[in-house]
Amino acid sequence: AKQLIKNPNITWKDVDASLPNTKIEVLGPPPTSGTRDAFAELAMEGGCKTFKWLKDLKKENKKRYKAICRSVREDGPYIEAGENDNLIVQKLTANPKALGVFGYSFLIENSDSIQGSYIDGVLPDFDNIAQGEYKVSRPLYFYVKKAHIGTIPGMKEFLREFTSDKAIGEDGYLTDKGLIPLPDKEFSKFKTAARKLTTLEALN
């Protein structure tokens, strides 16, 4: 059976001799955060899946797989900084050598003082995320129960607003919140589906 060993690394130089002798410090949200959950799924599990035995473990023992692939260190290098992304940004500004885990909108809003991290040589910018090239990003799915349309007041109007150009178009107000709009062809497809109340089965 494959075995895991304890991680004794305190500095980046401990990880790789070519890296600087800088203390490892990662500021991020607690387990209750959706951002933390997304990071665990996309980044941490993404790394796990590069090891065949861990990938196989997911099928054999999901509980152990999750314990291995979603656990963060509790001996100092990972610091839970709460669910306030602004606080993480402030701490990164104070310590440029630290890394942070937070939403894309905060990166854009503070691009004058912090920068995104490359993942496999790809920078987290608008185009790379829109094209699915940045691995630590994911699509947002918006589901509506068709039976609720006409029953729950405002549901139809909310659906139209959420899928409107002014909300999620290229210059929509939701882009200011960190959402990356779909390419024109896909946007048109889902906007039409929302207007016609096309079911998920029919859409696929």
Label each PLM-derived region with a short phrase.
Residues 1-204:
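Flexible loop/hinge segments at secondary-structure junctions
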